[in-house]
Amino acid sequence: MYTRFGPPIVFLISCYALILCGTVDALPRAPYFNDDINKTTTTSEDKTVGNTVVEEEKKTYTVGDSEGYQEASRLLQKSLNLSLDPCDDFFEYACRAWVDSHPIPDDLTSYSQFTATREKVLAEMRKLYEDNTSIPTSKSIALIKQIYNTCMDTEKHNAVGARDLLEKIKTYGYWPMVHNEKWRESTFDLTKLLSNTIQSRDVSVFFDFGPAEDSRNVSRRLLSFDQGSLGLGYSTRDYYLDEKKYEKQMKAYRKYTIGKVRYYTEDAGMAVNESKIESDVDEIIAFEKEWAQILVAEEDRRNYTKLYNVRRFDDLKEYMSIIDWKKLTLSTTPFLVHSYLKTNPSIIISDVEYLQKMNTLLQNTDPRIVTNYILLRWAGSWSQEIGKKYEDLQQEFAFQMYGRKQRQPRWKDCVSSAGGKLSYASGSMYVRKYFDANAKNTTLDMITDLQEAFRNMMHANDWMDAETKKYALEKADQMLKQIGYPDFILNDEKLDDWYKGLEGAPEDSFSQLVEKSIQWRNNFYYRRLLEPVNRFEFISSAAVVNAFYSPTRNAIAFPAGILQQPFFDARFPKALNYGGIGAVIGHEITHGFDDTGRQFDNVGNLRDWWDNTTSSKFNERTQCIIEQYADVKLRGTDLRINGKLTQGENIADNGGIKQAFKAYKSYLEKHGGQEARLPQFESLTNEQLFFVGYAQVWCGAKTPETKTLLLLTDPHSPETARVNTVLTNQPEFAEAFKCPAGSPMNPTKRCVVW
């Protein structure tokens, strides 16, 4: 698989939550307990939480009163509703108060603990970009601040509008639906048109192609070719294939597209013919519907052996003859790699049949429609640069499509845009100002604990044969650990060397800086076709609130952005940290052994290392997960989870919390059997607090429109299932809260893979 975004080009099958992936400093180990947390000794009586007895025996325990414990208590007071029965619906018990007190902001389509933390990081990055008290010593940091500042120049964007965009299109041979008779079909050249859109904005539309690690030999990179994405985004084919069911969304898409073309036509100084614009847009959507029938659904693209088809470069003309592939690649890659491309190198094609079908569709489609569509998609890459009236149109569409009530502040767009262009530079700024370096070692300690828990789970496993189990243990032991950030980003000289060749002139506009950064990035990664892969290269920006697993590196990554509340705080009870970041760590470790991660070996090569009988048993267990989640209906709707699409994330969720709980219990055994309880929550045992901590990560809500979209496109299950369905599979949860057998949170049937 190939992605053009992120620091290194690396195949990531997992991130802990959707967002629309070093070495560890030798720091002293952080203490597990502060000296002042064990203050008050209390004898408990039988207590209840809701209708559930949580203390049956008199026990002596302590209540912590440190600053960290007090803060953790205050946070939970805003989340838990202790009047509810945790055995009925744990999400409601652990999250209802938080959800009720944190309505979705008007400029967002969802709001959760994850979102709140991301919003915090965005605001922190804004402060850094807008801080003019000192001159940056790094050229890269100076450049990223220039990108932010030019992005924020809305007065200039409104004054220029779509003028630069339209002037550039003239050099491409005009836009039929905008320039009408100025476009000539006789001049249509698909290869040249795509060459222009890729060179300037990296818009290839019908396919993704570029350097990617060779899944069978991850020490090298090959050119990789994969299917493209529709106008509504990846995995949105269902909207086009069932227009009756998704009538609201498709009407909004049509209206939005018509509005944009109307504005483009006006800005080009051409006469607006409303009926002609509507006809052109209808032709485009009809074309997309045909294309949607060719695209393979993501849930059917989970066998990576089937997606690994090695061919020679010259074979492309056999599969997709409508494009001159040699001309296209030579015109969009740096001169340094031209000799390599002329050797007819090996390439990887994810789906040969897709290229063949796409070739037929393009050959049978009016060139006017193809040109209109490509330029419409290309123009979409200018959305932040062409002024308020286009942004207002986009907001109308976002309200219908995603339920977003108002456009987000400009500064959020610009923070995201700048960070996306120079992600290591943004990470450098964030780490220097906001990251506690001690968190790296504390996290490493927890990873060690989680890996030990996984090994113990593997040893206790009774369905794997000895040889497969032995190799699984080796893979777990050899998993690379990347925490916080790569060290080089804190060295100005090394950071600037990474971005060598990327420079902005003082007079550059935002659009010019965008194109320079895109062209630099593509040149940078294409040159890597000639270099061996550095398996140890950090796979994420530091200023990211997420976690990742890369199967082709067998690496887990925890950027600096996620190593904070509510996932982690060294001052909090370990129950909350193991339930929070501990479950995140376990989730990523488990991804190495989910339905897709298990297809790769200890160094990341695509290789079947499973005994056939053991593989069959794994598939049986996975099928249980698929069917279990497919039976989950979202509250208040008739929508159900796609169990096949979400199976990998569900396996990781279930395995991750099991590892985290075992690691926490092991920690308690090593430290006296219990830790101090939280003030105001003395009734919660250590084990119960662990599960509360796990649930906190997923407290949140989405608009109805976004729920629909994510059920179709997101490989993660909704928050309620990431709490309730996961915990129903954990007998330790039912034991901790003493849930009666047969109660909603203690069912008679459970699904367990790991």
From Swiss-Prot:
Q: How is the cofactor bound?
A: Binds 1 zinc ion per subunit.
Q: In which residues is Zn(2+) bound?
A: H587, H591, E649
Q: Name its co-factor(s).
A: Zn(2+)
> Which keywords belong to this entry?
Disulfide bond, Glycoprotein, Hydrolase, Membrane, Metal-binding, Metalloprotease, Protease, Signal-anchor, Transmembrane, Transmembrane helix, Zinc
Q: Where is the Peptidase M13 domain?
A: 63-754
**Which InterPro entries does the entry link to?**
MetalloPept_cat_dom_sf, Peptidase_M13, Peptidase_M13_C, Peptidase_M13_dom_2, Peptidase_M13_N
Q: Write down the top EC class of this protein.
A: hydrolase
Q: How does it sit in the membrane?
A: Single-pass type II membrane protein
GO CC terms in record: plasma membrane
Which residues carry out catalysis? E588, D653
Protein's GO biological process: protein processing
| Major location category of this protein | membrane
Q: A Gene Ontology molecular-function term?
A: metalloendopeptidase activity
Membrane-spanning intervals of the chain: 5-27
Its localization reads: Membrane
Disulphide connectivity of cysteines: C87-C739, C95-C699, C151-C414, C624-C751
> Its Enzyme Commission number?
3.4.24.-
Q: What's its job? A: Probable cell surface protease. Required to control the neuronal innervation of pharyngeal pumping.
Q: What is this protein called?
A: Neprilysin-1
